[in-house]
Design a protein with these regions (language model features):
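Conserved nucleotide-sugar phosphate-binding/catalytic loop shared by glycosyltransferases and other
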Residues: 13-15, 33-68, 142-143, 153
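Extreme N-terminal starter segment of soluble prokaryotic enzymes
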Residues: 3-10
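Histidine-centered beta-alpha loop that forms part of the nucleotide-sugar donor binding/catalytic region
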Residues: 14, 92, 113-117
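Short amphipathic alpha-helix
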Residues: 10-11, 18-29, 42
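Residues at the starts of beta-strands that form the adenosine-phosphate
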Residues: 8, 34-37, 53, 109, ...
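Active-site-proximal region of nucleotide-activated glycan assembly enzymes
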Residues: 108-156
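An amphipathic, basic-hydrophobic alpha-helix
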Residues: 63-86
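An aromatic- and histidine-rich active-site surface loop
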Residues: 86-105
């Protein structure tokens, strides 16, 4: 009898508050499923990732166009190497290429959790990711006016 494979879950976020919100959102999921983290290399993320499967991406900066190219190449590479079935992300911009290429190349399911900092207006990342998300969550009811197809999950 064949052993059923657990879904491969990519937990993708920027450092700082986005990482903290994703930690709150996923709780114990990483212990129960085949998960890996995808984020930026900072002192705090390196400490948190010490005992976790992870990938560090280059942060893209609008003023330095080459960083977007590097981030896209890294995103394609890691999507093809890791083959995530699901991406759970809180953004920010560094995760957009990974979501885009995973969706287009593999048909990966995407769960996006909008930042609690977005109370009445969105930042750029949710606007970009909304069209690729299979489940789009907002933390404030006022954000349902901006994203009417979203689900309000409450503040994490």
């Amino acid at each position: 009898m064949m052993k059923k494979m657990k879904p491969r879950i990519c937990l993708a976020c920027s450092a700082g508050g986005h990482l903290r919100e994703l930690q709150l959102a996923v709780g114990t999921i990483p212990q129960d499923y085949d998960c890996y983290w995808l984020t930026l290399r900072t002192t705090s993320t390196m400490a948190f990732m010490k005992d976790k499967e992870h990938v560090f991406l280059t942060n893209f900066q609008p003023a330095k166009k080459w960083t977007l190219i590097v981030n896209c190449i890294q995103a394609i590479f890691w999507v093809l190497v890791k083959h995530p079935n699901v991406i759970i992300t809180t953004g920010a911009g560094v995760t957009v290429p990974t979501v885009f290429f995973a969706k287009k190349l593999l048909g990966t399911k995407v769960i996006f959790i909008n930042s609690a900092a977005d109370v009445t207006r969105p930042s750029r990342t949710p606007v970009w990711i909304e069209k690729y998300a299979d489940l789009f969550l907002v933390q404030w009811e006022d954000m349902l006016k901006v994203f009417p197809k979203a689900t309000c999950c409450g503040v994490l």
